From Swiss-Prot:
Gene3D superfamilies: 1.10.287.3240. Belongs to the V-ATPase D subunit family. V-ATPase is a heteromultimeric enzyme composed of a peripheral catalytic V1 complex (components A to H) attached to an integral membrane V0 proton pore complex (components: a, c, c', c'', d, e, f and VOA1). Residues 255-264 have a biased composition (Acidic residues). Pfam families: ATP-synt_D. Its main location: membrane. The gene is vma-8. This is V-type proton ATPase subunit D. Keywords: Hydrogen ion transport, Ion transport, Membrane, Transport, Vacuole. One of its GO terms (biological process) is vacuolar acidification. It comes from Neurospora crassa (strain ATCC 24698 / 74-OR23-1A / CBS 708.71 / DSM 1257 / FGSC 987). It is a peripheral membrane protein.
Amino acid sequence: MSGAADREAVFPTRQSLGIMKAKLKGAETGHSLLKRKSEALTKRFREITRRIDEAKRKMGRVMQIASLSLAEVTYAVGGNIGYQIQESAKSARFRIRAKQENVSGVLLPAFEAYQAEGNDDFAMTGLGKGGQQVQRCRETYARAVEALVELASLQTAFVILDEVIKVVNRRVNAIEHVIIPRTENTIKYINSELDELDREEFYRLKKVAAKKQRDNAETDAQMKAKKAEQQRLALADSENAEGEQTENTPADILAAEEDEDVIF
């Protein structure tokens, strides 16, 4: 029998046994579902980790090319044109579109960068000289922004999945190592107590049956003894009655004596 610390504090009854069996079945089902959820999330987590590594490598290459392109623009134009671009820009050309992706019940945010149509505030920048370098630099930094948005989306999903996987794994471990063993120990305890009660009940019924047999045997013996006593008394009464009848009958004098033969 398990210790009280390793089982639920329940009263050992048939109803408690049914409740514990239902709880065990629910715990096993929940453990299976959470295990599959953890596996699905872990698979997606590894995929996101691989994509983050690729995105970082891509980001490094793109930023390197963008830096070189900006240096070319500065050299071709003959100075820093950042202030001209800032003065010309009225609204953001790049916009972020957010959506959610459901992965095994977990909502992961996904960001997507797109360019607003008809928004080209600094199209005339570099018209005098360095126009090709400016256009190439703009396209390069556009790819850099898209890479940054993709990396931000992946890293956000990475952080969320990391926390969710930890929570799910804690639940799986709690069910596997705490809830299921405690419930199984409780079921074993209830079964052992019920078996003990059944043995006690069987022993009690056996003792009751033996007592009934002894009582019946004693009753039969008493009835037989009583019947034999009645028969003996009846026989004695019959003998007494016959004796009294014999004493009360008149004696036959003639019959008692034999007649002597007379010889003439």
